[in-house]
């Protein structure tokens, strides 16, 4: 399964249903060398070239259920709907 958010396509997707955390990464998570947090509180990971390679979304399903989408600033605000992350949150 892949999930595309903005201009990044994440091919390493894991949803931890027990804690409602969605982990997204491009390839191997160990390529991340720099870390930041979006204004919404999502963890952002970047490679040595400054390219976004990972996003961790806490309360992913809760946000979709409550807001209908997940807002992520990367640096532009991207709105991610259930059509994008729904399969991952359903464990498909």
Where are these regions (language model features)?
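Peripheral terminal and inter-domain segments
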Residues: 15, 43-44, 88-91
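Cysteine/selenocysteine-centered motifs that mediate thiol-based redox chemistry or coordinate metal-sulfur cofactors
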Residues: 78-92
